[in-house]
Amino acid sequence: MKASVKVNGDRLRRIRTEQALTLRALGERSGVAFDTINKLENGHRPARLSTIRKLADALSVEPKELMKGEE
């Protein structure tokens, strides 16, 4: 079983838009499907740790910045 965690969707969206990235652009940069990113931003699904790592790398942030409960 792969570990999954809650993503702070609002924070993910804010960081993405601050970097002027569309869902598709972040998807291309990270290798994560844009519809998956959309679901994460809207709180419709948890993410695997590997997905959070890919998104964090693409956004040049620490993975913990994208997780729920981290301020």
What label would you give each PLM region?
Residues 65-71:
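Short amphipathic recognition helices of helix-turn-helix/homeodomain-type DNA-binding modules
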Residues 1-18:
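A short, Lys/Arg-rich alpha-helix, primarily the initiator
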Residues 20-39:
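Short alpha-helical DNA-recognition segment
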Residues 17, 31, 42-44, 53, ...:
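Residue-level detection of the helix-turn-helix DNA-binding "recognition helix"
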Residues 12, 23, 34, 49-52:
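Helix-turn-helix DNA-binding elements, focusing on the entry/boundary residues of the two helices
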